[in-house]
């Protein structure tokens, strides 16, 4: 019975992992289509289905392009 309760608690509290491989890419594959952009992201374009194309803001010291 303890094993069942332990397994139930572990499986109940696990969150599903997010797979970045299947996310829709945009902005020459440098952005991701989302409902809302995060704090460290900027809106660079619009995607289909009224989604926003967000790209992570790079710090000034490390500009990679």
UniProtKB/Swiss-Prot annotation:
Gene3D superfamilies, per the entry: Antimicrobial Peptide, Beta-defensin 2, Chain A
GO terms, biological process: defense response to bacterium; innate immune response
GO cellular component: extracellular region; membrane
Signal peptide (residue range): 1-20
Chief location of this protein within or outside the cell: secreted
Family, per entry: Belongs to the beta-defensin family.
Quaternary structure and partners: Monomer. Interacts with CCR2 (via extracellular N-terminal region); this interaction may preferentially require specific tyrosine sulfation on CCR2.
The protein's name: Beta-defensin 106A
């Amino acid at each position: 019975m303890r094993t069942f309760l332990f397994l139930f608690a572990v499986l109940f509290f696990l969150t599903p992992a997010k797979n970045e491989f299947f996310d829709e890419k945009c902005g020459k594959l440098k952005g991701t289509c989302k409902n809302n952009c995060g704090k460290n992201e900027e809106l660079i374009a619009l995607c289909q289905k009224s989604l926003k194309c967000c790209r992570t803001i790079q710090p000034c010291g490390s500009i990679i392009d």
